[in-house]
Structures are given as C-alpha cells and as structure tokens.
Amino acid sequence: MDESKKNERLQQLTDIQYNVTQKAGTERPFQNEFYDNEVKGIYVDIVSGKPLFSSNDQYDAGCGWPSFTKPIDEAEVIEHRDLTHGMIRTEVKSADADSHLGHVFPDGPQDKGGLRYCINSAALRFIPVDKLEEEGYQAYKKIFE
C-alpha cells in the first residue's frame, strides 16, 4: 500500500481502530461490532480495503470477537509469533497495510482445518452481499452463489 494513501486512511480511523490496527491493541469482547454478525458478506481491512474474511467462514467461537476458520486469500494475511503479555500466540496482520488484525489459534473446528482466526472488529469493515458490486467488490459475489 502506498505510504501517502495509508497515512490518509490512518487519519480517518477512530481511536479504537487506530489503537487496534497500529498499536496491536485489543477491543473488548462481546462489545464490538461484528462478534455476532449473521449477515452474509465479506470483511475487508479497515485501512487498505483488501478483502480478508468471508461470513461463510465465520462462526461463533464464544470468545466475543469475530472468529473465522480461514481468510479469503492466505496471501492477504501475515502470521508471526507474538510473545507479548506472557503468552505464546500467533499474531495476524494484513499483508497490504501491515494492520494488526488479531490472532490465530489451533482450537477451531477440526472439520474446517482446526484454526480460529480471532479478529478485532475495529480492524475490519463489513460489506454485505447486496453492496459488494456497489462497493467495487463484485468479484467476491461468487463466494455466495
């Protein structure tokens, strides 16, 4: 992502969006926008707009954050070891904007790969299926057909 475009987008973020995506913060469980979303659509990076996750892969993990079994395209997320807070975890960041998204854990549904991408709502923008074309994401309509 172009630095000037990224800086422009960063200035448009709310405090919580900035804290989560740029300072690896975490929003409160069960008190965020998408933890219980049941509308069909895709989730894009709040900074770059790149598609990251689909509601088809979202499930209720009971943790209070949106949880997914996989990203739409693995090339759009970067995973690396996170040793903060006295834990060993795997951080998930967006590849294009280097935004902190959340963490991935090996305790997801076994029949869907066994992973749980636990993602902060503040790092995402949701595009419902009926708005995909209008928002320029028409290529992703096929996911829901």
From Swiss-Prot:
The MsrB domain, residue ranges: 6-129
PROSITE patterns associated with the record: MSRB
Molecular functions per Gene Ontology: peptide-methionine (R)-S-oxide reductase activity
Annotated catalysed reactions: L-methionyl-[protein] + [thioredoxin]-disulfide + H2O = L-methionyl-(R)-S-oxide-[protein] + [thioredoxin]-dithiol
One GO term of the biological process aspect: response to oxidative stress
Enzyme Commission code: 1.8.4.12
A Pfam family annotated for this UniProt entry: SelR
Enzyme class: oxidoreductase
Keywords: Oxidoreductase
One GO cellular component term: cytoplasm
InterPro entries per UniProt: Met_Sox_Rdtase_MsrB (IPR028427), Met_Sox_Rdtase_MsrB_dom (IPR002579), Mss4-like_sf (IPR011057)
Active site: C118 (nucleophile)
Family from the record: Belongs to the MsrB Met sulfoxide reductase family.
Protein name: Peptide methionine sulfoxide reductase MsrB
Lineage of source species: Bacteria, Bacillati, Bacillota, Bacilli, Bacillales
Gene: msrB
